[in-house]
Regions:
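Short cysteine/histidine-rich zinc-coordinating motifs and their immediately flanking basic loops
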Residues: 20-25, 38-44, 83-89, 102-108
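Canonical alpha-helical transmembrane segments of integral membrane proteins
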Residues: 335-351
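Juxtamembrane amphipathic/hinge helix adjacent to a transmembrane helix
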Residues: 304-327
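Short cysteine-rich clusters marking metal-coordination/redox-active sites
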Residues: 8-11, 26-29, 72-75, 90-93
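Charged, low-complexity helical/coil segments in non-catalytic cytosolic or luminal regions
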Residues: 107-308, 328-329, 333-334, 355-356, ...
């Protein structure tokens, strides 16, 4: 039988169990720890795995009788629509080489979110996008014509699961005081533990290899309470993509967002420290369920200098995202201008208050720099560029339920620094 050796989080010396107190003791530094904290510290970091229950219902013979499949020879898209709808071009690449095919298997969607945004509204959203964007490249300043506009149902997998998180942090509190000609700094070291659980419903991951995850995640959220049961008639006049990325492959992305949400939620419960770092973590998920759905998207492309740019619009809410780049030259000029203006105003105020010391000017410069960066990032945000989501917090049903909240002081160390006299500073 293997022997497990536990080490002190403070000094790394061996720990022994004290039957009287029920705690783990360190003979080297006299620290005491609860058993569950030491067990958590020694737990391996491991990514949570979920056994999601994937759907198995395929299109029925009745569905197939009322539906038409198409195959794009250009990009390989596998598409379906209602039987009376005739497709003349691929909604992804615009190719006219789209051939009729037969419905041959495929997971049947359980729900469909209908289109609310009309073609005219989507076109207005595209045209309005270019107004007031300070960091748009000059090529978008005029003649923004729609090259192609397509109405498409995109296949998604919706993931439900429960998550458990247990994280140990190293935390510090820093205190500085003056004792005569000495500056004394004391750093207190703590071990902090947080454990909790979260439940998630309907985390969407698109099941189309042809749709960039950054675009589909930027279109969130959809109001799934407005979804209707799938029937072939729902596809009348609209193409729908076959899910060519299965639920097992999409599971990883859902779990990544769940883990990130769990980590962020537990970290947000740690307060009152000057610095906090993760010492160890254990995140797991369970009870997974998967639901296949179709969600509405308008795809619009425009061509500039022989390059195609894509705009995607949430067909339910009208939310827009795109792959338009930032004009870096304009971003620099706006940042420099904002810095100069803010710093100049701060310098004027300090001059009027007769506070033009080197320390105050340095602080004014730092504040001006941060303010200028805020201006630039605000302007970049106006471009609505597609970006991946980093969490699934919006799909949590109750937020984080905290089960363990543990803060224990470990030790403190003190440093002393001699302060140069004001006379010496003035002479220098």
């Amino acid at each position: 039988m293997a022997t497990v050796a536990y080490k002190c989080p403070n000094c790394a010396s061996p720990l022994t169990y004290d039957g009287t107190t029920g705690k783990m003791l360190c003979a080297a530094c006299d620290s005491q720890f609860d058993q569950d904290t030491i067990e958590a510290l020694n737990a391996q970091e491991e990514a949570g795995t979920v056994d999601f229950v994937a759907p198995t219902e395929e299109y029925s013979a009745s569905d197939a009788a009322h539906m038409q499949a198409y195959h794009c020879k250009s990009c390989g898209a596998e598409l379906i629509t209602e039987g009376t709808t005739t497709a003349t071009e691929c909604p992804y690449c615009g190719s006219p080489t789209i051939l009729p095919d037969r419905i041959d298997g495929g997971i049947r969607p359980e729900m469909v979110v209908p289109f609310v945004i009309t073609k005219e509204q989507a076109q207005q959203a595209f045209e309005g996008y270019f107004k007031g964007k300070k960091l748009l490249p000059n090529i978008f300043k005029k003649d923004n014509q729609i090259a192609e506009m397509r109405k498409l149902f995109v296949p998604y997998w919706l993931f439900d699961c429960n998550a458990e998180g247990d994280i140990i942090y190293n935390a510090e509190k820093k205190h500085t005081r003056r004792e005569g000609e000495w500056e004394v700094t004391t750093v207190e070291h703590y071990i902090v533990r947080r454990a909790g659980s979260m439940s998630f419903e309907n985390i969407p991951v698109d099941g189309s290899v042809k749709m960039d995850d950054k675009i589909t995640e930027s279109l969130e959220p959809y109001d799934l309470t407005k979804a209707v049961p799938f029937q072939p008639t729902v596809l009348s006049g609209v193409m729908a993509d076959h899910a060519d990325v299965d639920a097992d492959d999409c599971e990883k992305r859902a779990v990544e967002r769940v883990e990130s949400s769990m980590i962020n939620s537990l970290r947000n419960t740690v307060h009152g420290y000057d610095s906090v770092s993760v010492r160890s973590k254990n995140i797991s998920a369970s009870g997974g369920k998967v639901t296949p759905v179709l969600l509405p998207v308008w795809l619009i492309t425009t061509r500039k200098d022989d390059k195609v740019y894509t705009f995607a619009i949430n067909g339910q809410t009208g939310k827009l995202t795109c792959d338009v780049p930032t004009d870096k030259g304009k971003a620099f000029l706006w940042g420099a201008g904002a810095f100069a203006g803010i710093f100049g105003l701060a310098a004027l105020v300090l001059y009027l208050l007769k506070m033009l010391a080197s320390g105050t000017m340095l602080m004014a410069g730092i504040v001006s720099l941060f303010a200028a960066l805020i201006v630039v990032f605000t302007l970049i945000g106006q471009l609505k560029q597609a970006a991946s989501k980093t969490s699934a917090a919006g799909y949590s049903t109750e937020g984080c339920q905290l089960h363990v909240q543990y803060d224990r002081f470990l030790y403190a160390n003190t440093t002393r620094r001699k302060i140069e006299s004001q006379n010496k500073e003035a002479a220098a």
